[in-house]
Amino acid sequence: MRLKSKNSWIDELKKNRQSYGISQNKLAVASGITRPYLSDIENGKTVPTEQVKQALLDSLGRFNPDNPLDMLFDYVRIRFPTDDVARIFGEVLHLNIDYMIHEDFGYYSYPEHYRFGDIMVMASHDLSKGILLELKGKGCRQFENFLLAQHRNWYDFFTDCLEEKAVFKRLDLAINDKTGILDIPELARKCKQEECISVFRSFKNYRSGELVHRDEKPDMGNTLYIGSLKSEVYFCIYEKDYEQYVKLGTPLEEADIINRFEIRLRNERAYYAV
């Protein structure tokens, strides 16, 4: 009876992991252990330390789809001070350069780029420009899948970048509000009436009024910027459900995310965030 009691948390862990749709590998990487070790824990072949047990429970809790908030990286731009693009692919990205599509043109005045899906790497033989990695929203999600297959996470990747003396040009952190905790029109109203106490001296509020129809909710399509868009740090808060409605035609009541709160960091601010 005591043995069953001791193992009850393992049964609950396995049950919740499966109900959340989380693989052993994904939970193991998030918890800082190997997949075989987690498999042995779930099968009762080994007893984890209290530290490992807590790491597993904390990591699984973050994957709970019923959590009202979750956080992710939504934009990453990093420059590497080298012209050895093959080395960056091999030592930092851990991707096979032969699988990338190569084009003889680039962006940000780079002469060429490599692409796999939405993962973009700009290259130049000019050392002052170096190698530039850009991951937008979809690119971040795609790269996360590669990190998972590599048994790495964002922390491991950023550590490898720092070892290469990389320069963090921009980093966007997004917090998804799944239940409508934030009332963006109300926040915009309070900013306008100077009821918002903040170190930031400016704000901007945009509303996609031309896309609002009579049968839709009032004040939808709001985007609120707090801080100067030219500064190294500012906030962007917008109605994600409305964005998906406009882009994809997803009904508002079927949206997984109601609002999104983004922290946009550039240069030194991005570096210190890492």
Language-model region placement:
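Short, conserved catalytic or interaction motifs in soluble domains
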Residues: 43
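Short Lys/Arg-rich cationic patches that frequently serve as NLS/NoLS or arginine-rich RNA/DNA-binding motifs
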Residues: 1-3, 32
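DNA major-groove recognition helix of helix-turn-helix/homeodomain DNA-binding modules
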Residues: 49-65
